[in-house]
Structure formats: C-alpha cells, structure tokens
Regions:
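N-terminal glycine-/serine-/threonine-rich beta1-alpha1-beta2 phosphate-ribose binding loop
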Residues: 1-83, 92, 96-107
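Predominantly a Rossmann-like dinucleotide-binding segment in NAD(P)-dependent oxidoreductases
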Residues: 104-135
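ATP-grasp fold ATP-binding core
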Residues: 86-88
C-alpha cells in the first residue's frame, strides 16, 4: 500500500498493523513490493483523499493523473501490466482522463472505475430486507 498523505482520520496504519500488510514510501515500491519489478496482480487506485487545492471551477484537484502516471511507469518498466480499478472518475481534466483511459488500450490491461463505497464494511453492520423503505 502507498498513501500520498496521511490525514488525522487515516486508517491505513492501524489496518496495516492489524492485518500485517506493508505500507511503502512510493507507488513504485508498493507495486514492486519493495523489489525491482511489478509484483502485484492488480491495483486498487484511490486518489481522492487528502488536502489538495481547488481550481476556479471549484473542482478538487486530486492528483489522480500524476499518481496514475507513476503506476503506468512501473507497468512500462516491468514489461507487463495488471488490472487497475480506479475509485471514482479519472480526472477533473478531459485531456488527462483521456490519456489515463488510452493507457489501458496501449498496454492491454483491464481498467475499471466506479465507487468503492458499496464494497466497504458497514460499521455497525446493517442488512436491510429486500424492499425495505429507506429515508
């Protein structure tokens, strides 16, 4: 795992301690598991946490493109690519988003995007009966 920023509400360190996974100092180290070449079977890319500026349109300038470029660099240098899941949209900028999309075609890897929220644990647990009204 790699985290670009570690805000006060970050859970990565506690979860790493609890479940025994490593946190690396760079994206390259995380994808290579500290070695010299790509060593993972897939990438879950969540680029929407931390303190980043806003542009004149009020868009939060999360560095998804810049972080994704580092993932692509590792793929290119390793001579192989793996599936990437991008939490949320690719970028606030069409040109950057298009480049991100195009890389999956050029390097022949599956690229998925959406929200990871439906896949997270509910704390406390909550199971609603099918057809239950929700306010």
């Amino acid at each position: 795992m790699y985290t670009d920023q570690v805000p006060s509400n970050d859970m990565s360190r506690a979860l790493a301690s609890q479940y025994g996974f490593r946190i690396f100092g760079t994206i390259r180290e995380a994808l290579c598991l500290g070695g010299g070449t790509l060593a993972v079977d897939g990438v879950a890319f969540i680029g929407e946490h931390g303190e980043y500026p806003f542009n004149e349109k009020g868009q939060h300038l999360y560095p998804r493109y810049e972080l994704y470029k580092q993932i692509i660099d590792v793929f290119r240098e390793s001579g192989r690519a793996v599936a990437v899941y991008c939490d949320k949209h690719f970028s606030y900028d069409w040109t950057k988003a298009k480049w991100m999309y195009d890389q999956s075609h050029e390097l022949h890897f599956p690229l998925m995007a959406g929200s990871s929220v439906p896949l997270t644990w509910r704390r406390p647990p909550l199971e609603l009966e099918l057809g239950s009204p929700v306010d």
